[in-house]
């Protein structure tokens, strides 16, 4: 077969060399061989090729340019510079029935032999490379079976991994340049593998192909990896979010909550300082660690447009001061706007917009494996009349509700039972033997947050609470009786809601947690049902028949 024919069919032939000690991989661009060479010139190399079709006994000279040629002692002339590299392995020939191919040795087409009524068993094919020859041409076939791209990729990948395994533990510019360059003196960029190998092997990282590179290419390699890194995985360190108590200017008190007090303060501008009560832990030495791991870590790893912007935290075990510093939002809570500003009329588009923003924030928190545990309209702040931010997440804990200790009582706010899912309400049981609550944590989950959003969605649609002014024990009893019994009194009010919204609300309020949709699914459904604003052109068209000027 001619050289052009071999090049066209893409035959690969490689000569693998081993050395007594190796530290880098080097390939001569003209001889088409890959060898392991030591940086010391005193050691000799030994040939370990599978066959002796193209032995190389002399060590390769130092490559000063891309045109250096390795000497060969074989009688076979060295391949031209344009010849593709090969590796010497045996063919695995089996009978073939292919008639629409030609012999790769004599280049005769098999169909002509079939017309001359020769036996089909006279055609043989290799299981590895797919070469097809006549039976009479088997003796003329050389042991140069074409390797597959997967096989070649495995050889090169293992070679690079073995030679750079220790260096990759602490990647540096020098270590990357050693693994990607052929020799210290090489100044040009050459390819160690065929185009097919570079295309099919390592598709996810294009620059981790078996190509040589200069120091400039190494800089590009590092920059592209940094661009591919997920920005959400680059989290702030604890030192970046630690704030000294003296650096925060605490001013006026905004309000009190179940878990602490909120103050208006200053920290490089307006800020909200939320002091968290950690007195429920009797062991004072554990308060700082629990505060950092359970509360601060959730805020530190969260960045979203509809989540309260986190500045840092204050932890001072000496003075028993633990606080979270966030951005200050001058508007009131969503509860205040829905239930206290009764004179304001809300259109349906505003309801959809606020609901969508809440679900987007909660979908982000659930993606980060963070549970809110206390999703209510009082924990949703208004940045402006049409934008909300979610706050006070990861603060809910049964031990905080039990503090200070009372006889068979629990300190809960108004309408808190309305946001509890049935599986959470079922755990609010009292141990009458010890006159205290059971010492186990409430089973909060992503589904319980979805149930809480269902109550918020009901408030946005009807501007009232689902259970009205009932006492907490009546609400808890109705919750334990099942969802259908609790919704019987709401049938008349739910008739005012659109059918699709009614269906979404009931799915969020399902008594079976596995049947509740995720926040990601709710975002898609609200986006589809959200009314679109009518453009000015459409308004003119709709009123054209009423205006005689049109």
Curated annotation (Swiss-Prot):
Residues 248-528 form the Protein kinase domain. It comes from Caenorhabditis elegans. The protein kinase domain is predicted to be catalytically inactive. One of its GO terms (biological process) is vulval development. The lineage of its organism: Eukaryota, Metazoa, Ecdysozoa, Nematoda, Chromadorea. One of its GO terms (molecular function) is protein kinase activity. Disruption phenotype: RNAi-mediated knockdown causes sterility characterized by a lack of oocytes. In a ksr-1 n2526 mutant background, causes larval lethality. This is Kinase suppressor of Ras B. Interacts with ndk-1. InterPro entries: C1-like_sf, Kinase-like_dom_sf, PE/DAG-bd, Prot_kinase_dom, Ser-Thr/Tyr_kinase_cat_dom, Ser_Thr_protein_kinase, Tyr_kinase_AS, Tyr_kinase_cat_dom. Residues 21-56, 63-75, 177-193 have a biased composition (Low complexity). Keywords: Meiosis, Metal-binding, Zinc, Zinc-finger. Belongs to the protein kinase superfamily. TKL Ser/Thr protein kinase family. The gene is ksr-2. GO terms for cellular component: cytoplasm. The keyword Zinc applies. The keyword Repeat does not apply.
């Amino acid at each position: 077969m001619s050289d052009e024919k071999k090049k066209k069919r893409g035959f690969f032939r490689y000569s693998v060399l081993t050395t007594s000690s190796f530290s880098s991989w080097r390939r001569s661009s003209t001889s088409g061989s890959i060898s392991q060479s030591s940086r010391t010139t005193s050691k000799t190399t030994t040939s370990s090729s599978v066959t002796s079709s193209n032995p190389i006994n002399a060590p390769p000279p130092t490559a000063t340019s891309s045109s250096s040629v390795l000497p060969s002692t074989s009688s076979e002339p060295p391949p031209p510079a344009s010849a593709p590299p090969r590796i010497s392995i045996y063919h695995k020939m089996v009978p073939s029935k292919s008639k629409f191919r030609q012999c790769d040795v004599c280049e005769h087409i098999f169909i002509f032999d079939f017309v001359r009524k020769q036996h089909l068993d006279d055609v043989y094919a290799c299981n590895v490379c797919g070469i097809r020859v006549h039976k009479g041409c088997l003796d003329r076939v050389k042991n140069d079976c074409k390797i597959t791209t997967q096989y070649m990729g495995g050889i090169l990948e293992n070679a690079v991994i073995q030679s750079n395994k220790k260096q990759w533990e602490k990647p540096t510019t020098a270590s990357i340049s050693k693994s990607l360059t052929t020799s210290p003196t090489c100044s040009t960029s050459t390819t160690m593998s065929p185009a097919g190998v570079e295309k099919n092997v390592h598709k996810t990282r294009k620059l981790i192909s078996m190509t040589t590179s200069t120091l400039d290419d190494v800089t590009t390699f590092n920059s592209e990896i940094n661009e591919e890194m997920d920005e959400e995985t680059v989290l702030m360190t604890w030192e970046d979010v630690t704030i000294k108590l003296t650096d925060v200017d605490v001013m006026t008190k905004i309000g009190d909550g179940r878990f602490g007090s909120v103050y208006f303060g200053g920290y490089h501008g307006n800020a909200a300082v939320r002091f968290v009560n950690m007195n429920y832990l009797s062991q004072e030495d554990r308060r700082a660690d629990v505060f950092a791991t359970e509360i601060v870590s959730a805020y530190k790893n969260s960045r979203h447009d509809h989540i309260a912007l986190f500045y840092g935290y204050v932890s001072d075990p000496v003075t028993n001061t633990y606080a979270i510093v966030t951005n200050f939002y001058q508007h009131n809570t969503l509860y205040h706007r829905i239930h206290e500003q009764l004179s304001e009329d809300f259109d349906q588009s505003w309801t959809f917009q606020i609901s969508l923003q809440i679900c987007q924030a909660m979908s982000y928190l659930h993606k980060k494996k963070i549970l809110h545990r206390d999703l209510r309209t009082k924990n949703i702040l208004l940045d402006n009349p049409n934008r909300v931010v979610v706050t006070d997440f990861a603060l809910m804990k049964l031990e905080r509700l039990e503090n200070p200790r009372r006889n068979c009582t629990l300190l809960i706010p108004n309408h808190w039972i309305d946001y509890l899912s049935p599986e959470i309400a079922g755990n609010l049981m009292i141990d009458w033997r010890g006159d205290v609550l059971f010492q186990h944590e409430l089973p909060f989950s992503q589904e319980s947050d979805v149930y809480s959003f269902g109550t918020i969605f009901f408030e946005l649609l009807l501007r009232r609470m689902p259970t009205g002014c009932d006492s907490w024990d009546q609400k808890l009893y109705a919750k334990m009786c099942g969802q259908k019994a609790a919704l019987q009194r709401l049938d008349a009010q739910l008739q005012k809601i659109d059918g699709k919204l009614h269906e979404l609300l009931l799915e969020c309020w399902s008594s079976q947690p596995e049947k509740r949709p995720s926040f990601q699914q709710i975002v898609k459904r609200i986006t589809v049902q959200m009314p679109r604003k009518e453009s000015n052109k459409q308004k003119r068209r709709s009123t054209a028949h009423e205006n005689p000027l049109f």
